[in-house]
Amino acid sequence: MSRRHKAEKREINPDPKFGDLVVTKFMNAIMLDGKKSVAENIVYGAFDVVQGKSKQEPLTVFHSALDNIAPHVEVRSRRVGGATYQVPVDVRPERRQALAIRWLIAAARKRNETTMVDRLSGELLDASNNRGSAVKKREDTHKMADANRAFSHYRW
């Protein structure tokens, strides 16, 4: 890790269809091997399926899904006197969003539907209704932090 300069945040452009920066970040996270057009087709296709199934605006479903997945606290390892404690710490807003996007994509990839569009739309709908494995991951993270609340005085 460099001690001299902090890396600058890169500017990203909003996506062409909705004009939303979070959707662009989501597309970039889904993208494999630099194939952005494939990632766009997956995301926009999933949004179309979500709109057809839920009769709601896909962007609101997407944002509510991310809000339901994003963790508020997580545990970090802290070594104190030969023992390693799992210390609960609050999650910064940028990290909350990044974790939510990462967990949503991982949960969608593990699903059993045939195409990624179906998997992603199913996980988005589940997450917006507080179901699904991405929401379970958030609950597990919160339980872990709650169980280790006794070590919260080791924060840094």
Swiss-Prot record:
Disulfide bonds: none
GO annotation, cellular component aspect: small ribosomal subunit
Subunit structure: Part of the 30S ribosomal subunit. Contacts proteins S9 and S11.
Taxonomic path: Bacteria, Pseudomonadati, Pseudomonadota, Alphaproteobacteria, Hyphomicrobiales
GO terms (BP aspect): translation
Protein function: One of the primary rRNA binding proteins, it binds directly to 16S rRNA where it nucleates assembly of the head domain of the 30S subunit. Is located at the subunit interface close to the decoding center, probably blocks exit of the E-site tRNA.
Pfam families, A to Z: Ribosomal_S7
The family this protein is said to belong to: Belongs to the universal ribosomal protein uS7 family.
Gene: rpsG
Protein name listed in UniProt: Small ribosomal subunit protein uS7
Keyword tRNA-binding recorded: yes
Gene Ontology terms for molecular function: rRNA binding; structural constituent of ribosome; tRNA binding
Keywords from the named record: Ribonucleoprotein, Ribosomal protein, RNA-binding, rRNA-binding, tRNA-binding
